[in-house]
């Protein structure tokens, strides 16, 4: 039997696809449902009420226990609501398919907002929904290319160049270490360096890591250009879930330049000195192993600046992979001088 209260209960009622919310007074669940359908011009058959916060259905039995000003949602046949989770899902859908109306409304709210936290949230929303991620060429998104040389005609080309520049920088650091190698071993060091250089040229300095148009196995991003932080060198993943899409807008492109391709086994402290010592030892060095540590994702992690730990990693090269398996006589050892001190 439908419970009828002596005093009407006042609640706040909204419909699923309506931005309006009304105060409605009723003595029973059925009366409230009827008034709600009239207010929102919805069909009564199949309609029901639920709590806005968690989607619990409001029945005749639980209606008397509702607090005054409870927020309820009116659902028609076939509609569902899971509480705040549904609200968050609808909010997130804005990022995937932003509409001009949403952007305009957010800008209006931001212009009138005084609270710093709400300003930050609205500004972040505008930043993300205003991105022109799908655009690729200078003609499609001229603002993205502001400050870049005219030779860059598309986003993927510039991001590929950006990655190549980082890898070239690592190569220069390895080359600069030549003077630290014993004079008698420098020729072999330069030979190994030359092999690495040829390998890098053949793969275009691994510029594909930042190119969203590259094969999935060759890039560090999604086909849309989203990069996820891989976390500090001593963790499996990023606990803060940092992500960025430098293809979206100019600001994101600039911010992405602060992300690091961090060597898990450190380049200056460990990899390069170990390479030099191995060459001075006289055996044939497995230069491909050192190449992988210096220039490839085997030993590189893409990390947000907050996840880039500057502390000593205290990780060593795999001793079993430093030299090639000996199949003949041992190469004559070069004259050895004092080993160079490891750079700190």
From Swiss-Prot:
Pfam families from the UniProt entry: CIDE-N, DFF40
Residues annotated as domain CIDE-N: 7-83
Cross-referenced InterPro entries: CIDE-N_dom, DFF40, DFF40_C, His-Me_finger_sf
Activity regulation information from UniProt: Inhibited by DFFA (DFF45).
Keywords: Apoptosis, Cytoplasm, Hydrolase, Nuclease, Nucleus
GO biological process: apoptotic chromosome condensation; apoptotic DNA fragmentation; negative regulation of apoptotic DNA fragmentation
GO CC annotations, alphabetized: chromatin; cytosol; nucleolus; nucleoplasm; nucleus; protein-containing complex
Broad EC category: hydrolase
Keyword Nucleus: yes
Binding partners and assembly: Heterodimer of DFFA and DFFB. Interacts with H1-1.
Role of this protein: Nuclease that induces DNA fragmentation and chromatin condensation during apoptosis. Degrades naked DNA and induces apoptotic morphology.
Protein name: DNA fragmentation factor subunit beta
Lineage: Eukaryota, Metazoa, Chordata, Craniata, Vertebrata
Gene for this chain: Dffb
């Amino acid at each position: 039997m439908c419970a009828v209260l002596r005093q009407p209960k006042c609640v706040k009622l909204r419909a699923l696809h309506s931005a309006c919310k009304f105060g409605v007074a009723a003595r029973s669940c059925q009366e409230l449902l009827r008034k709600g359908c009239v207010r929102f011009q919805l069909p009564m058959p199949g309609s029901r009420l639920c709590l806005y916060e968690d989607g619990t259905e409001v029945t005749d039995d639980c209606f008397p226990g509702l607090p005054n000003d409870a927020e309820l949602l009116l659902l028609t046949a076939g509609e569902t609501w899971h509480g705040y989770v549904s609200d968050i899902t609808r909010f997130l859908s804005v990022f995937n398919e932003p509409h001009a109306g949403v952007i305009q409304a957010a800008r209006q709210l931001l212009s009138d907002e005084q609270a710093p936290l709400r300003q930050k949230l609205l500004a972040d929303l505008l930043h993300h929904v205003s991105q022109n991620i799908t655009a690729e060429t200078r003609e499609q998104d001229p603002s993205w290319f502001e400050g870049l040389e005219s030779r860059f005609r598309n986003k993927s080309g510039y991001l590929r160049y950006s990655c190549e520049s980082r890898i070239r920088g690592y190569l220069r650091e390895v080359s600069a270490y030549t003077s630290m190698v014993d004079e008698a071993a420098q020729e072999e060091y330069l030979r190994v360096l030359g092999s690495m250089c040829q390998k890098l040229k053949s793969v275009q300095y691994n510029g594909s890591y930042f190119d969203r148009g590259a094969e999935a196995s060759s890039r560090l991003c999604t086909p849309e250009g989203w990069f996820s932080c891989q976390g500090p060198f001593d963790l499996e993943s990023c606990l803060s879930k940092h992500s960025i899409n430098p293809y979206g807008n100019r600001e994101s492109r600039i911010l992405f330049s602060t992300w690091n391709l961090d060597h898990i086994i450190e380049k200056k402290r460990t990899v390069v000195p170990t390479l030099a010592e191995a060459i001075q030892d006289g055996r044939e060095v497995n230069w491909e192993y050192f190449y992988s540590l210096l220039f490839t994702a085997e030993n590189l992690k893409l990390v947000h600046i907050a996840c880039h730990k500057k502390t000593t990693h205290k990780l060593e090269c795999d001793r079993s992979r430093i030299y090639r398996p000996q199949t003949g006589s041992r190469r004559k050892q070069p004259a050895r001088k004092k080993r160079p001190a490891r750079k700190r």
